[in-house]
Amino acid sequence: MAQHTAAAAGGDEEVAEAEAAAAAAAGSTLRHRHAGKGAEEHEAAGGGGGGRNGGADDPDATSVERVFADKAVPSWREQLTLRAFVVSALLAVMFSVIVMKLNLTTGIIPSLNVSAGLLGFFFVRLWTSAVERIGLLKQPFTRQENTVIQTCVVSAYGIAFSGGFGSYLFGMSETIAKQATEAKDAQNIKDPHLGWMIGFLFLVSFIGLFALVPLRKIMIVDYKLTYPSGTATAYLINGFHTPEGAKLAKKQVKTLGKYFLFSFFWGFFQWFYTAGDDCGFKNFPTLGLEAYNNRFFFDFSPTYVGVGMICPYIVNVSVLLGGILSWGVMWPLIAKKKGSWYPADISDNSLHGLQAYRVFISIALILGDGLYNFLKVLIRTIAGFISMVQNNSKGMLPVSDNGMSMSTAEEVSFDDERRTEIFLKDQIPKSVAYGGYVVVAALSIGTLPEIFPQLKWYYILVAYIVAPVLAFCNAYGSGLTDWSLASTYGKLAIFVFGAWAGLSHGGVLVGLAACGVMMSIVSTASDLMQDFKTGYLTLASPRSMFISQVIGTGMGCVIAPCVFWLFYKAFSNIGTSGTEYPAPYAIVYRNMAILGVDGFNSLPENCLTLCYIFFAAAIAINLIRDLAPHKVSRFIPLPMAMAIPFYIGSYFAIDMFLGSVILFVWEKLNKAKADAFGPAVASGLICGDGIWTLPQSILALAKVKPPICMKFLSRAANAKVDSFLAG
């Protein structure tokens, strides 16, 4: 912690530079670090359009495009450069490794847009500087090319998440099936293999790109949907390409590199002490052995300290509260009912025992939270359409950047006029969109049953008929709130298609595969609209954005399965509860699929009652959050975040809370530097520890074992060991 607080206590000159650069980047460059999927939607939506429309008395002072007025906008072909895609591929591998590690440990994926943007800017600047010195630079680095890189990288590493390697895809495996209550037959199991995973992702990941392309003008120009994450990314990129922003970006990259090296070498140092099970700093009983047995300890993970610095305070506090409620109160109390509520002769890790309460109560919280937010966004979407119908008759557009109606007769700003002109210049033919959707759908309908024989062609046909409607709802809702409900639509598919198939016809596998189909379409369509918003605000061509998204998706369909395969082969205990890589959402998704086809027959006593209580509590807490004044609601925890430690424990919650404390203290000491450099520090901690996983995996594959086991024993256990060794 001393390192972080010391970094915050820099000189006044650096603070002034940071403040000036932040102001030059339209005030919102780094303020939106929380505006990612799964982040606090109210914070994201509230700041999404800020900084751009203020100061109406002096348009030149607040106009972003007047700053770049003397720079020609490159054609869409010039925006697609070889160096952009080389850098994108390198960063895609890096971030796919990081996301995969997060997937397989806790399933919490923070927004990595800031680090992706910083590193993309840095590497191409490095490239162009080197080429310029030898006099071979033909094309300068523009913000449009920067946007292409950002789009390509995010779409590539996004496959590591939406591909289901920590959820539905891995949930099909025998490893996870053995830990479930039933459906362990061959009909409901499919183990991972590199070939079919790559094929599956190519079949399902592209169709979402075609679903909403014809509606881009309506969503971005006519409705003026905010898309806070896309807006924040655009401000970040615009800021980099001003003189002040470039200067700040260099300092941020230097800071990121410093903490990257610290985190990487800390991971390397820890490796030497992990020669056996439960060895090393990751198993340090910092709060005592009894707390350690209940999964309360600090595991010295730079990754989750960094995640805690990126996630909103309320998320981190919610996760910690969930850990205290479950592992500190509920599970010890339920454990005392052993022999009464569930058989005394089975392990606590059996889904016929205590583990059932851990898994199914967390599922109840997740489903309650998901259902509430699904209905909330659906209501807002319907309300938006009603507003559109009413206002169209009055010559009004339904939504402006501040969420208010805007007259078509209202004076259009220089920025909006310039952006709309460029955005409508390079059209994507509707024949490409419609034809692409039909062709990819036909290929999927014909080929997916070869990968999953249980997944009949008519299941896929129904999914592809319904998917564009759901994709539009999700993209519209995401534009309003920054809240993507792709995983909720995926869970809905689990129940609908799993129940349709039935347990005896591989319903569990059908539900999980259908979840992947639906999630991929809905998530990709929403992400594409976010990227179109970024392109709109940086004058990047929609055509170059679409091509970049296609190339990035193709990269991800190869890179993500290869990275997962590396983990799967290098670490033998992936997916096992209580290990370094428990893949918690894999067991959660599989048990959802079992519930969808078989109901609640196998749950232990009172488990279903507790599930009902927590399902209702999740809805009630969300309702109170929305009805209460902001000064009260910002202290009410998030049920979805509380559910995460119910199954895997609180060790990562302590890491994340420590990250929050570090950032909070830093902001109190020096808010300007914390705002400017906090995301860079966090990204360095996450990236360094994540990238260390690559050499660690290679060492494991080469059968190179660490030399030392550092383990902690109680006094009594130590005495027994000493006695045994003494003979």
Curated annotation (Swiss-Prot):
Ranges that cross the membrane: 84-104, 107-127, 152-172, 194-214, 256-276, 314-334, 359-379, 432-452, 460-480, 492-512, 546-566, 604-624, 646-666, 681-701
Keyword presence, Transport: yes
Protein name: Probable metal-nicotianamine transporter YSL14
Pfam family, one: OPT
One MF term in the entry's GO annotations: oligopeptide transmembrane transporter activity
Family indicated by similarity: Belongs to the YSL (TC 2.A.67.2) family.
Compositional bias segments (type: Gly residues): 45-54
Membrane topology label: Multi-pass membrane protein
Tissue specificity: Expressed in leaves and at low levels in roots.
Keyword Transmembrane: yes
InterPro entries (UniProt xref): OPT, YSL-like
Origin: domain of life: Eukaryota
Lineage: Eukaryota, Viridiplantae, Streptophyta, Embryophyta, Tracheophyta
Main location: membrane
Job description of the protein: May be involved in the transport of nicotianamine-chelated metals.
Compartments where found: Membrane
Chain intervals for the UniProt region annotation (Disordered): 1-61
NCBIfam families the UniProt entry points to: OPT_sfam (TIGR00728)
